[in-house]
């Protein structure tokens, strides 16, 4: 359980960034930060 939580925490943090928002897919595709 601890491994799963540790893996999801950074993902949730990245997806939760206001500067990325719903453009996460395009950001990951282009590999650029919208910030």
Curated annotation (Swiss-Prot):
Domain of life (superkingdom): Eukaryota
| Modification comment | Processed by the macrocyclase-peptidase enzyme POPB to yield a cyclic decapeptide. POPB first removes 10 residues from the N-terminus. Conformational trapping of the remaining peptide forces the enzyme to release this intermediate rather than proceed to macrocyclization. The enzyme rebinds the remaining peptide in a different conformation and catalyzes macrocyclization of the N-terminal 8 residues.
Would the keyword Manganese be found if you checked this record's keyword annotation? no
Sorted alphabetically, which InterPro entries does this protein's record hold? Amanitin/phalloidin
Pfam families cross-referenced by the UniProt entry? Amanitin
Keyword annotations from UniProtKB, A to Z: Toxin
Q: Can you name one GO molecular function term for this protein?
A: toxin activity
Q: What role does it play?
A: Cyclic octapeptide that belongs to the MSDIN-like toxin family responsible for a large number of food poisoning cases and deaths. Cycloaminide E is structurally related to other cycloamanides that are non-toxic to mammals but show immunosuppressive activity.
Query: What is the name listed in the Swiss-Prot or TrEMBL entry for this protein?
Result: Cycloamanide F proprotein
